[in-house]
């Protein structure tokens, strides 16, 4: 590992890369590894995930097909197209199986934030995962990949299930404690009954691990105890 966050351009140069792959355009910014054009001049190829590419607009909904496009393109770049197609076929089958186990319930995807919760909106990886799992996004009317809302709106929409994104800087256990202690949220059925599904952060950004997010969501809902929404 070169750095806990983005390495500096100098640090990456020391590694003598042939190719630089990034999930987000910010990796090639001033606080990242530098401009892509500079790497091209050095003979180093670069690639940004289609979900993070600046040419893409997140007013257009991200779809599982976009993730498969990324797998296909990277497999072609490295000359392993057959392996890419096998991986895509495997993911397609796993997603279809997962979707067959889920119940279509109204889900709030809580990424983080306590004053103004950041939730899965219309067009990013959270909505893509929810759609693939066959559930309804309670905040699909918000624009962008993630959107800020209010706890009053959450109460009004009364999600049947709440996804808790588990990150080292904002763990799911901490989110549960917050919900249970909130003066109004604690009375929501989903909070009182702990109708939660915990999904690791690594599965919630667009990429090869999204299949794990779809499986975790579908299986988590299917495993909710008797009396849970159906």
Question: What is each of the regions a protein language model found here?
Answer:
Residues 4, 22, 49, 140, ...:
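Short beta-strand and adjacent tight-turn residues that come in two discontinuous sequence segments
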Residues 10-14, 33, 37, 65-72, ...:
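Solvent-exposed, polar/charged alpha-helical surfaces in well-ordered, non-transmembrane soluble domains
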């Amino acid at each position: 590992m070169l750095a806990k966050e983005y390495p500096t351009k100098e640090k990456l140069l020391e590694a003598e890369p042939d190719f630089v792959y990034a999930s987000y355009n910010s990796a090639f910014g001033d606080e990242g590894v530098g401009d892509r054009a500079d790497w091209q001049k050095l003979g180093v190829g670069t690639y940004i995930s289609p979900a993070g590419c600046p040419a893409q607009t997140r007013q257009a909904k991200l779809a599982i097909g976009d993730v498969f496009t990324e797998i296909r393109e990277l497999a072609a770049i490295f000359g392993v197209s057959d392996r890419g197609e096998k991986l895509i076929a495997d993911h397609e089958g796993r997603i279809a199986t997962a979707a067959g186990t889920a119940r279509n319930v109204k889900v709030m995807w809580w990424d983080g934030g306590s004053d103004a919760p950041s939730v899965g909106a219309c067009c990013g990886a959270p909505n893509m995962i929810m759609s693939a799992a066959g559930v309804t996004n309670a905040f699909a009317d918000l624009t962008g990949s993630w959107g800020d809302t209010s706890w009053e709106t959450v109460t009004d929409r009364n999600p049947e299930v709440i996804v808790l994104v588990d990150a080292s800087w904002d763990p799911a256990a901490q989110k549960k404690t917050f919900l249970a202690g909130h003066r109004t949220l604690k009375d929501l059925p989903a909070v009182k009954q702990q109708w939660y599904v915990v999904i690791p952060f690594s599965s919630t950004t667009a990429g090869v691990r999204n299949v794990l997010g779809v499986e975790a969501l579908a299986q988590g809902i299917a495993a909710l105890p008797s009396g849970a929404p159906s």
